[in-house]
Amino acid sequence: MTEAQIKEKVYDIIVSKMGVNKDQIKPESKFSDDLGADSLDTVELIMELENEFDVQIPDEDAEKISTVQQAIDYIVKK
């Protein structure tokens, strides 16, 4: 899967989990500050990313993922 495909899928997951419009999402968007996620939303988003991309994201790594681009970069590296 290419980085562009991963980005598209991550955006789709954010739209479905957080109820935002795709045009509101930017790579630098912070889940809590810019997209209105609370801590539960963020946990659910991380779990959905794990399921969709078949990766395990340990809690200590998940805590460091606060922007859309950080999520994409993490998945690309795995």
UniProtKB/Swiss-Prot annotation:
One of its GO terms (molecular function) is acyl carrier activity. The keyword Transmembrane helix does not apply. Residues 4-78 form the Carrier domain. Keywords: Cytoplasm, Fatty acid biosynthesis, Fatty acid metabolism, Lipid biosynthesis, Lipid metabolism, Phosphopantetheine, Phosphoprotein. One of its GO terms (cellular component) is membrane. Coiled coil: none annotated. PROSITE patterns: CARRIER, PHOSPHOPANTETHEINE. 4'-phosphopantetheine is transferred from CoA to a specific serine of apo-ACP by AcpS. This modification is essential for activity because fatty acids are bound in thioester linkage to the sulfhydryl of the prosthetic group. The modification O-(pantetheine 4'-phosphoryl)serine is found at S39. GO terms for biological process: lipid A biosynthetic process. It is found in: Cytoplasm. Pathway: Lipid metabolism; fatty acid biosynthesis. The keyword Cytoplasm applies. It comes from the Bacteria. Belongs to the acyl carrier protein (ACP) family. Carrier of the growing fatty acid chain in fatty acid biosynthesis. This is Acyl carrier protein. It comes from Chlorobium phaeobacteroides (strain DSM 266 / SMG 266 / 2430).
